């Protein structure tokens, strides 16, 4: 059991995090984990360094683990780069699990997703969890496809970003 909450608001111009509301919800002892979408899906909002740092500090204060869902990190507007949650501070790095999927490079069905965990104790727990059912074993085609996408897919990805920006409503 847990509590589902949203702390993102829209002021007519931009989406933002209500940090007062977030802190009230983090103070609830019934919950211990926060899922952060970065960039946010479906709005595409790339959270700035200050917001990510503040989220990290607040979650550490209340002993919250942050699962940072960064599966859309490649699909940003042209010339806009996302900021990985774990890259902002040591606190964020040691108190988070980052999930990245290669959906944008059309590798969704190949088991090429990544889980990044810097904290050794937390990484051990994650490894045990994903290896219990052997779901962490990519096939040989997935490895080759991922390598090709990362080494030869930049131009294609840039063109995809431009196309998405053109057709955006």
Regions found by a protein language model. Give the residues of each.
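PLP-dependent aminotransferase class I/II
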Residues: 95-169
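Active-site phosphate-binding strand-loop segment of PLP-dependent enzymes
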Residues: 10-80
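Substrate-binding/gating loop at the entrance of the active-site cleft, primarily
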Residues: 1-5
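Hydrophobic residues at beta-strand termini and immediately following loops
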Residues: 6-8, 99
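Aromatic/hydrophobic pocket-lining residues that form π-stacking "cages" and hydrophobic walls in ligand
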Residues: 55, 85, 169
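Short, conserved catalytic or adaptor-binding loops enriched in Gly and charged residues
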Residues: 86-92
């Amino acid at each position: 059991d847990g509590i589902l909450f949203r702390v993102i608001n829209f002021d007519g111009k931009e989406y933002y995090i209500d940090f007062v509301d977030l802190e009230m919800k983090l103070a609830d002892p019934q919950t211990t984990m926060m899922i952060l979408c970065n960039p946010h899906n479906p709005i595409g909002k790339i959270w700035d360094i200050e917001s990510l740092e503040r989220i990290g500090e607040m979650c550490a204060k209340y002993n919250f683990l942050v699962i940072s869902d960064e599966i859309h990190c490649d699909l940003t507007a042209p010339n806009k780069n996302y900021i990985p949650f774990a890259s902002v501070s040591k606190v964020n790095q040691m108190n988070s699990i980052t999930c990245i999927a290669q959906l944008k490079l059309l590798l969704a069905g190949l088991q090429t997703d990544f889980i990044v965990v810097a904290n050794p104790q937390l990484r051990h727990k994650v490894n045990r969890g994903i290896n219990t059912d052997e779901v962490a074993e990519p096939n040989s085609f997935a490895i080759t496809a991922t390598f090709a996408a990362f080494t030869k897919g930049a131009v294609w990805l840039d063109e995809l970003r431009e196309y998405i920006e053109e057709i955006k409503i």
